[in-house]
Swiss-Prot record:
CDD domains: Hb-beta-like (cd08925). InterPro entries: Globin, Globin-like_sf, Globin/Proto, Hemoglobin_b, Hemoglobin_oxygen_transport. Heterotetramer of two alpha chains and two beta chains. SUPFAM superfamilies: Globin-like. One of its GO terms (molecular function) is oxygen carrier activity. Heme b binds at residues 63, 92. This is Hemoglobin cathodic subunit beta. The keyword Zinc does not apply. Red blood cells. Signal peptide: none annotated. PROSITE patterns: GLOBIN. GO terms for biological process: hydrogen peroxide catabolic process.
Amino acid sequence: VHFSDAERDAIAAIWGKIHIDEIGPQSLARVLIVYPWTQRYFSKFGDMSSVAAISGNPKVAAHGKVVLGALEKGVKNLDNVKATYSNLSQLHCEKLNVDPDNFRALGDCITIVVASKFGNAFTPELQNAWHKFLSVVAAALSSRYF
């Protein structure tokens, strides 16, 4: 996948404004709430019986930070995203048995949280580049499945 200079600039601009400690927990919590079947992958996280329980769960927050923090590797390696996430793809495929459709769902939730945080500053042009980036990351994470 080729990223244009404008797309690279947009992705860097978005990433430069993201606070992992805020966006990460909100994004993972949103996935677990909107797509409740994803909770099965996080059975060790304890109580996830309600929106409040998920949103206030410190293990969800901590893992959300890890998940979002892992995106930085992709941002820094736009020319080789697939190789960047090869080990994570293998882990999620062979050990964790995560349905690869969930990577797209997570990307959608990250985008929603980012859009709600940045409001009108999250222009269609920025969204287009960000969506392309997250789609490439989701494909890379799914690569060991196919």
